[in-house]
Amino acid sequence: MDEGWTRWVLEKYNFPLDTLHNQDIINGDLSQYSAIIIPSQSGSAILHGYADNTYPKEYSGGIGLNGLLALKEYAEKGGRIVALDESSDFLIEQLGLPIKNVVKNTPSTTFFIPGSLVRIDIETSDQLTFGMRKESVAYFVRSRAFDIIELRDTGEGGKETLKQRPPSQPVKILARYAKKDILLSGWAMGEEKNIGGKIAMAEVSLGRGSVVLIGFRPQFRAQPRNTFKLLFNSLY
């Protein structure tokens, strides 16, 4: 469903695009694309897909290990992968990105936003956020919030937290959830404690390319037009 919303929005705004199926990723020439979007989907569905006995063969299965390696090589050679919401968990885990989803294992009894408008603060100086206002709104539907993984160096005096990440894999923070008064419309529980000030969008370098992680769905149901720009800017 998320792929359909994404495709509809891009077609509506006259973006040239291809829908990539499993074999296109595994065996195709990905270098022809400036960006590859991974719509919101579970890691299991991306990697393994649906079983052959539940769907026609052309719609079953996933990209598998070969597809994952193809995506990794694509980014390392200069491509950009754009992950929306749930698919960001898959890329963080499988590509070993130095960032984490801080609400991944948080129980719904302490933090829950089933589908609400939340405030986000944008770093407007970057080309990926061009045209956005510093204060904006995102649609949060059981979505993600990120934080950079701290590196620790063990020396003679014990462990020391490194304040700066080595230049080989920098993380560029593009948007954060507001620190307070996060909820704009809808219902939320535990929002300030769990996502207040956390990263909502980031770009992580990978070889000569990068992975853009958008913790929410900027194109959800083709409705939140104010965040379409975050998706569009990520394509170039």
How would you label these PLM feature ranges?
Residues 4, 65, 69, 89, ...:
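A structural signal for well-ordered alpha-helical segments within the folded catalytic domains
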Residues 61-71, 110-112, 166-170:
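Glycine-rich, flexible loop segments associated with nucleotide phosphate handling
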Residues 5-9, 14-24, 114-116, 120-126, ...:
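Extended alpha-helical regions
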Residues 1-98:
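Helical hinge/lid and interdomain linker segments adjacent to catalytic or ligand-binding clefts
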Residues 23-25, 87, 105, 179, ...:
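Short, solvent-exposed coil/turn elements at secondary-structure transition points
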Residues 15, 31-33, 72, 77, ...:
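In a subset of proteins, long, contiguous C-terminal domains/tails are tracked
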Residues 101, 108-110, 116-224:
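Catalytic beta-strand/loop cores that center a nucleophilic Ser/Cys/Thr
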